[in-house]
């Protein structure tokens, strides 16, 4: 089924320019949204709790900052870009008491609305504007006169103005220059979670670790295994990112291409596909989100235990040692400290 697409000519920038926008959160997306909205002639304030380390950065970049409650009271459009696991508390404590008839509550991801963790009053427009790229790219493309494609969705539309407002917002951060895709909260949330869990984060991570283990257990040096299953992954992903699977296969050697065709289906087979379907079902029926909420309510104990176990995998020890040899690789603070 073809998606519905919109561009700058379909958007009325004056709609969002006539509103007061509160952006709650100043992480990757928060800073990109806030600065680009301001540069598009929109009134913007940033909401951050007292004592937040980001407050100084906000003022240095010429934006006004106040508490989430105060900016929510001031604004008529509120974009909630805090982490998923913090949003419900922020909504309950800071946003909901300050919502007025006709306000709009926007999100950059649909999880809390789709799974009912946040339930806005019926007289509020609920929408989503979600750039399909990290915040630094969203901002850089905007400054360069370009844009990153965006998704928009509307969950509640009491006044029938939700889509026009979301499209105007997307245009103000550069999204309509590239293209805006209309979706639903359900589709965005479930596809995003599935991609993260089955392929991008969970699936890729386990594939890499298992490949490393097989090689080391067969007697190969851990350093050789690291190079072959992790380090070179970037080369392959970059080719796929630029031109799809066909570009990758065109660019690698005939030996690599032929071997991939033969052995790939032996690794990812029909049983794997069934397990992927089970993962998707857990997402769709709320099983995953219930576990996510339980983890947060338990003080993130399960997440911390999983992080600790992951950090102890031999591939991490080997990788840290090898990355010391790579002057061209940006090192995370945790490795350079």
From Swiss-Prot:
One of its GO terms (biological process) is isoleucine biosynthetic process. GO terms for molecular function: ketol-acid reductoisomerase activity; magnesium ion binding; NADP binding. InterPro entries: 6-PGluconate_DH-like_C_sf, KARI, KARI_C, KARI_N, KARI_prok, NAD(P)-bd_dom_sf. Mg(2+) 1 binds at residues 192, 196. Residues 3-183 form the KARI N-terminal Rossmann domain. Its EC number is 1.1.1.86. Keywords: Amino-acid biosynthesis, Branched-chain amino acid biosynthesis, Magnesium, Metal-binding, NADP, Oxidoreductase. Signal peptide: none annotated. It comes from the Bacteria. It catalyses: (2R)-2,3-dihydroxy-3-methylbutanoate + NADP(+) = (2S)-2-acetolactate + NADPH + H(+); (2R,3R)-2,3-dihydroxy-3-methylpentanoate + NADP(+) = (S)-2-ethyl-2-hydroxy-3-oxobutanoate + NADPH + H(+). Pathway: Amino-acid biosynthesis; L-isoleucine biosynthesis; L-isoleucine from 2-oxobutanoate: step 2/4; Amino-acid biosynthesis; L-valine biosynthesis; L-valine from pyruvate: step 2/4. Residues 184-329 form the KARI C-terminal knotted domain. One of its GO terms (cellular component) is cytosol. The active site is at residue 109. NCBIfam families: ilvC (TIGR00465), PRK05479.1 (NF004017). Involved in the biosynthesis of branched-chain amino acids (BCAA). Catalyzes an alkyl-migration followed by a ketol-acid reduction of (S)-2-acetolactate (S2AL) to yield (R)-2,3-dihydroxy-isovalerate. In the isomerase reaction, S2AL is rearranged via a Mg-dependent methyl migration to produce 3-hydroxy-3-methyl-2-ketobutyrate (HMKB). In the reductase reaction, this 2-ketoacid undergoes a metal-dependent reduction by NADPH to yield (R)-2,3-dihydroxy-isovalerate. This is Ketol-acid reductoisomerase (NADP(+)). It comes from Mycobacterium sp. (strain KMS). The lineage of its organism: Bacteria, Bacillati, Actinomycetota, Actinomycetes, Mycobacteriales.
């Amino acid at each position: 089924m073809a998606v519905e697409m919109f561009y700058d000519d379909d958007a009325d920038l004056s709609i969002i320019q006539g509103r007061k926008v509160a952006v709650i959160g100043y992480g990757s997306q928060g800073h990109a949204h806030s600065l680009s909205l301001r540069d598009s002639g929109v009134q913007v304030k940033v909401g951050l709790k007292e004592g937040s380390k980001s407050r100084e950065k906000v003022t240095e970049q010429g934006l006004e900052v106040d508490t989430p409650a105060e900016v929510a009271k001031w604004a008529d459009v509120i974009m909630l870009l805090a982490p998923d696991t913090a949003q419900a508390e922020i909504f309950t404590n800071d946003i909901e008491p300050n919502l007025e008839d006709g306000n709009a509550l926007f999100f950059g991801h649909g999880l809390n609305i789709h799974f009912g963790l946040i339930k806005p009053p019926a007289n509020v427009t609920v929408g989503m504007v979600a750039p399909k790229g990290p915040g630094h790219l969203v901002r850089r493309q905007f400054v360069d006169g370009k844009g990153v494609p965006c998704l928009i969705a509307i969950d509640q539309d009491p006044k029938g103005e939700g889509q026009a407002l979301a499209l105007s917002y997307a245009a103000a951060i550069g999204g309509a220059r590239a293209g805006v895709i209309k979706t639903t909260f359900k589709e965005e949330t479930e596809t995003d979670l599935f991609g993260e869990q089955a392929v991008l984060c969970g699936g890729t991570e386990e594939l890499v670790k298992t490949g490393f283990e097989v090689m080391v257990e067969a007697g190969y040096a851990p350093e050789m295994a690291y190079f072959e299953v992790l380090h070179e992954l970037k080369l392959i992903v970059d080719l796929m990112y630029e031109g799809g699977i066909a570009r990758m296969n065109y660019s690698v050697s005939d030996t690599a291409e032929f071997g991939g065709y033969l052995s790939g289906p032996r690794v990812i087979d029909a049983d794997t596909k069934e397990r992927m379907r089970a993962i998707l079902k857990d997402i769709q029926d709320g099983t995953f989100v219930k576990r996510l909420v339980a983890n947060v309510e338990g003080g993130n104990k399960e997440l911390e235990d999983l992080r600790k176990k992951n950090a102890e995998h031999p591939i991490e020890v080997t990788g840290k040692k090898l990355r010391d040899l790579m002057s061209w690789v940006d090192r995370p603070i945790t490795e350079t400290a």
